[in-house]
Amino acid sequence: MSISKKIVFVTGNAKKLEEALQILGTSFPIESKKVDLPELQGDPIDISIEKCKIAAREVGGPVLVEDTCLCFNALKGLPGPYVKWFLDKLEPEGLYKLLDAWEDKSAYALCNFAFSEGPDSEPIVFAGKTDGIIVQPRGPRNFGWDPVFQPDGYKETYAEMDKSIKNTISHRTRSLQKVKEFLKSKGYENCKFE
C-alpha cells in the first residue's frame, strides 16, 4: 500500500515515545512531533478525542495522541487525567500520601491512544488498563508516577521493573496492541510512501 504521509505521534515526552516505539516496533511509519496541545479537562475518552482532533488540524495528516491517567479507587478515579498536575505539585511521595486516610490503596493505570487519519476524520480511541496498588515510592524517578504504581501480581513498581517486563503488561502496552492491530488492518504496516 502507498500512503502519502507518516503517522505523527504528537508528544514531547521522550520516555513515552521510546516506550511506544519499543511496543509498536519498526514496521509502522511513525515520527514524533511536539505540538503544544491544550491541557483539557473532562472524561478521559473525551479528552483523548478532542486532543486528537486538535492535533490532526495542526499536523494536517494522520496523528496519534496519548493521554494517561492514574486513578485511585478510594478517590473515585482521581487524580485521573489530572495526575500530571498532582505529580508536579506533590511528587511521588505526595501521590502516595493522598491515600493516607483510606485503607483502599487499589488503583488502575489507564492509557488512551487516539488515532485520526486527518483533520476531516473522526478519531478512534484505544484504551488500555492495568490494575494495581499505590505504594510508597520505589525505584528510579525518571518517568512520572511509575515509582508509586505496583501492578497486580508483581512485587515491583513500574519504576523497578525491567523495561522488557513493563512493556508486556503496562496500560500503554495494552492500548498500543490495539493500535497496532488497527494500523495493520488499515494497511499501515510496512507501507511505502508516494
Swiss-Prot record:
<dbReference type="InterPro" id="IPR027502">
    <property type="entry name" value="ITPase"/>
</dbReference>
<keyword id="KW-0464">Manganese</keyword>
<dbReference type="InterPro" id="IPR029001">
    <property type="entry name" value="ITPase-like_fam"/>
</dbReference>
<feature type="binding site">
    <location>
        <position position="84"/>
    </location>
    <ligand>
        <name>ITP</name>
    </ligand>
</feature>
<feature type="binding site">
    <location>
        <begin position="171"/>
        <end position="172"/>
    </location>
    <ligand>
        <name>ITP</name>
    </ligand>
</feature>
<feature type="binding site">
    <location>
        <begin position="143"/>
        <end position="146"/>
    </location>
    <ligand>
        <name>ITP</name>
    </ligand>
</feature>
<comment type="subunit">
    <text>Homodimer.</text>
</comment>
<dbReference type="InterPro" id="IPR002637">
    <property type="entry name" value="RdgB/HAM1"/>
</dbReference>
<dbReference type="GO" id="GO:0047429">
    <property type="term" value="F:nucleoside triphosphate diphosphatase activity"/>
</dbReference>
<keyword id="KW-0378">Hydrolase</keyword>
<feature type="binding site">
    <location>
        <position position="166"/>
    </location>
    <ligand>
        <name>ITP</name>
    </ligand>
</feature>
<dbReference type="Pfam" id="PF01725">
    <property type="entry name" value="Ham1p_like"/>
</dbReference>
<keyword id="KW-0547">Nucleotide-binding</keyword>
<feature type="binding site">
    <location>
        <position position="39"/>
    </location>
    <ligand>
        <name>Mg(2+)</name>
    </ligand>
</feature>
<keyword id="KW-0546">Nucleotide metabolism</keyword>
<protein>
    <recommendedName>
        <fullName>Inosine triphosphate pyrophosphatase</fullName>
        <ecNumber>3.6.1.66</ecNumber>
    </recommendedName>
</protein>
<feature type="binding site">
    <location>
        <begin position="67"/>
        <end position="68"/>
    </location>
    <ligand>
        <name>ITP</name>
    </ligand>
</feature>
<keyword id="KW-0460">Magnesium</keyword>
<keyword id="KW-0963">Cytoplasm</keyword>
<dbReference type="GO" id="GO:0036220">
    <property type="term" value="F:ITP diphosphatase activity"/>
</dbReference>
<dbReference type="GO" id="GO:0000166">
    <property type="term" value="F:nucleotide binding"/>
</dbReference>
<feature type="binding site">
    <location>
        <position position="51"/>
    </location>
    <ligand>
        <name>ITP</name>
    </ligand>
</feature>
<dbReference type="GO" id="GO:0009143">
    <property type="term" value="P:nucleoside triphosphate catabolic process"/>
</dbReference>
<dbReference type="GO" id="GO:0046872">
    <property type="term" value="F:metal ion binding"/>
</dbReference>
<dbReference type="GO" id="GO:0035870">
    <property type="term" value="F:dITP diphosphatase activity"/>
</dbReference>
<keyword id="KW-0479">Metal-binding</keyword>
<dbReference type="GO" id="GO:0005737">
    <property type="term" value="C:cytoplasm"/>
</dbReference>
<dbReference type="GO" id="GO:0009204">
    <property type="term" value="P:deoxyribonucleoside triphosphate catabolic process"/>
</dbReference>
<comment type="function">
    <text>Pyrophosphatase that hydrolyzes non-canonical purine nucleotides such as inosine triphosphate (ITP), deoxyinosine triphosphate (dITP) or xanthosine 5'-triphosphate (XTP) to their respective monophosphate derivatives. The enzyme does not distinguish between the deoxy- and ribose forms. Probably excludes non-canonical purines from RNA and DNA precursor pools, thus preventing their incorporation into RNA and DNA and avoiding chromosomal lesions.</text>
</comment>
<dbReference type="GO" id="GO:0009117">
    <property type="term" value="P:nucleotide metabolic process"/>
</dbReference>
<comment type="similarity">
    <text>Belongs to the HAM1 NTPase family.</text>
</comment>
<feature type="binding site">
    <location>
        <begin position="11"/>
        <end position="16"/>
    </location>
    <ligand>
        <name>ITP</name>
    </ligand>
</feature>
<dbReference type="GO" id="GO:0036222">
    <property type="term" value="F:XTP diphosphatase activity"/>
</dbReference>
